[in-house]
Amino acid sequence: GLVGSEMCIRDSVWTSPKALQTMAANAYEAIRNAYPDSVKYEAGYNRLRSTLKELDIRTAEKIARSGVKYFIVYHPALTYYARDYGLRQVAIEADGKEPSAKQLTAVIRQAREDGVRRIFYQNQFPASTVEIIARDIDAEYVEIDPLDEDAIGAIDAMTDSITAK
């Protein structure tokens, strides 16, 4: 396997619409238990639940239509997103370390063979390694922000980039 293809529990669970739905349900349940007489949270939760369900459906449909099987990203921040939508995340760095020359060569060779068109990186990490790989395989490098305050917009944009031809 390629470097960084293993799941890492510490990665950004909130990048997955499915996980966001679970997080929202758990938060709502905790609030409801803490304030059992309050009904004002229910309407907000129901709106959020509906929005997240639509995001989940939209994400799944885009990925299914695209035929994409995996994507390359500098830091493995999309582990739960990949897991929940049947994708494989190939991370350039592993455990906070730059790849070895051998690992980098393997990523480049596989990306060339598969015709990878985009490599993703987060603005919290250096883009230099991503730029080198992208140039080498004639792909574009795309910035994503898994910490964006607009999680729904960020997930939509990320999905569009991952599934674009």
Model region roles, listed by residue range:
Residues 5-165:
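Extracytoplasmic metal-acquisition and chelation regions
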